[in-house]
Amino acid sequence: MKIKNSLKALKARHRDNRLVRRKGRVYIINKQNPRFKARQG
């Protein structure tokens, strides 16, 4: 999982990326291609 300050560019890398909020953190998840997972930090 990548940890980035800004997820906007990462979200645009794949059309199946989803932006989700869990426990106060912001994540990018991708069921089709899990290598795009990222967390904002």
Curated annotation (Swiss-Prot):
It comes from the Bacteria. GO terms for cellular component: ribonucleoprotein complex; ribosome. One of its GO terms (biological process) is translation. Coiled coil: none annotated. Keywords: Ribonucleoprotein, Ribosomal protein. The keyword Cell cycle does not apply. InterPro entries: Ribosomal_bL36, Ribosomal_bL36_sp, Ribosomal_L36_bact. Belongs to the bacterial ribosomal protein bL36 family. This is Large ribosomal subunit protein bL36. The lineage of its organism: Bacteria, Pseudomonadati, Pseudomonadota, Alphaproteobacteria, Hyphomicrobiales.
